[in-house]
């Protein structure tokens, strides 16, 4: 029973790290990356469709993305969706390809993005601590129900704390890497 709780806590903490990593990936850095456009939805024949289902996003060079639209009639809709996104991008179409030059980030914008990334990391840490709290309360519940001893509970809480520290360290590493990437000129 205790092992199940620990395994569940470890799995949930791993998911917290992955979710934090995904949130950090959405933050725009100075470099072109296809995942930058993952959140964009295109009004395609009356329904909102993810951009990657309407076209193929590739990296043209370090500061330019290219979107090869599958259906030429959707080019204007794709351009409009990119322009109306909060990414501050200005697409230029050339035939069935839309080029998106990424403007360099200003120092002020970089600092703002670092704040955003730090907030995402803190949310990840809080989520991991909540998982730890849930696991610890489950251990205490088992002790109340006389299914395990106080020593088992204390030992299990220490093991869950080690798992927690490991996952928080992973988030801190993600944060440090993202901050370095953002502040790189």
Curated annotation (Swiss-Prot):
It is found in: Cytoplasm. It comes from Shewanella amazonensis (strain ATCC BAA-1098 / SB2B). InterPro entries: Ribosome_recyc_fac, Ribosome_recyc_fac_dom, RRF_sf. This is Ribosome-recycling factor. The keyword Acetylation does not apply. GO terms for biological process: cytoplasmic translational termination. GO terms for cellular component: cytosol. Responsible for the release of ribosomes from messenger RNA at the termination of protein biosynthesis. May increase the efficiency of translation by recycling ribosomes from one round of translation to another. Belongs to the RRF family. It holds the Pfam family RRF. Keywords: Cytoplasm, Protein biosynthesis. The gene is frr. One of its GO terms (molecular function) is ribosomal large subunit binding.
């Amino acid at each position: 029973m205790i092992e199940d709780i620990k395994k569940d806590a470890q799995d949930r903490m791993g998911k917290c790290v992955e979710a934090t990593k995904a949130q950090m990936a959405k933050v725009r850095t100075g470099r072109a990356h296809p995942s930058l456009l993952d959140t964009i939805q295109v009004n395609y024949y009356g329904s909102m469709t993810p951009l990657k289902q309407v076209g193929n996003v590739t990296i043209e060079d370090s500061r330019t993305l290219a979107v090869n639209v599958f259906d030429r009639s959707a080019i204007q809709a794709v351009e409009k969706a990119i322009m109306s996104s909060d990414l501050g991008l200005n697409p230029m179409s050339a035939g069935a390809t839309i080029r998106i030059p990424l403007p360099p980030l200003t120092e002020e914008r970089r600092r703002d993005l670092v704040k955003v990334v730090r907030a995402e990391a803190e949310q990840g840490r809080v989520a991991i601590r909540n998982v730890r709290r849930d696991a610890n309360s489950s251990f205490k519940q088992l002790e109340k129900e006389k299914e395990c001893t106080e020593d088992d509970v204390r030992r299990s809480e220490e093991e869950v704390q080690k798992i927690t520290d490991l996952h928080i360290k992973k988030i801190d590493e993600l944060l440090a890497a993202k901050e370095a990437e953002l502040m790189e000129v």
